Amino acid sequence: MENLTKIICLLVFGWCIGAYAQGEATGNDWSKMGLKGKVKSVKTSIYFAEAKDNDFVKGTPFSQGIYPPEKIKQYSEMERMGVKAFFIQFLVNIIPSAITFDKNGFITEKWLYNTVSPKKIVYTYDKKNHLIDKTTFVHDFLETKDTLIYNTKGQLEKEVLDLKTKDETIYTYTYNIDGELIQRNFKKVEDLPLFKEIYIYNNKRLVNKELYQFDQLIWRGLYEYGAEGELIKAISQKIDDFIWHSKYTYDQNNQLKEEYLLINESEKNGFLNRFGSDRRLTYHLTFSTNYLCEYKYTDDKQGNWVKMITYEQGVPILYVERKIEYF
């Protein structure tokens, strides 16, 4: 059971890289992070908020992110397995960190400070801006090395994740004649379980994702789209465990406005999320506890937010500061 758990963690660890194979690499990291202008670096720091002169100032530093590392891992793994949750995409990235970009808008280096030992992640690209290497260091010691190999069409074909332990983890990708990812296989060199992911499309849009272990279905994702291609419904089911139902609404500019999620079809278990520009989260209600979190922002001249005050049940809790440097 312990080995199986490790395998699943490895499987989802590589999911974020696998997104490149599904066409999510369109655009650069500036656009993925909702950044405007030619951003050179972003440094995020978090403090407890303190009231002063009808305003809020930085108090004692807060060492972790809005979510603790274990919660980030849990939510991130669920999302990588097929759960569509835009509030998760936003909140898991609000952590003490420093990110550097190249002039094409791609991340070259990232420091994460929300763990006991800070992590440094170095990104390397080829001449076509394909990510070919992602290496993580802890105290200057190599922790993981992720190597990505592309075919002549520029599609991700193979990924090798070296955890500097006994062996390597290997992912392989298969595409149809339209260039759509249809299968992703996962294996280790040792004689351990083989997983595979199957992707099904309709009119160029992903409508079904299935995850198999020993040819047994263990996870399923179903997706429905609107007239403009926007995601309007998503169902994610871990077989014999739980199911997430998600619905999304958009404004007149087709920008995400609201996200409504139910867990196990219970109106007492889920979330209601509202978004402003750049998909920045403004409202996050947890149904099971009726607990409301709100987020208010201050922007710089480029329109990027540089300060966020988080409120819990109307009480200011955290002061998030982003120092943004431009080319």
Task: List the predicted regions and their residue ranges.
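Buried hydrophobic residues that stabilize the cores of well-folded domains
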Residues: Q22-F327
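Bacterial Sec-dependent N-terminal signal peptides
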Residues: M1-T26
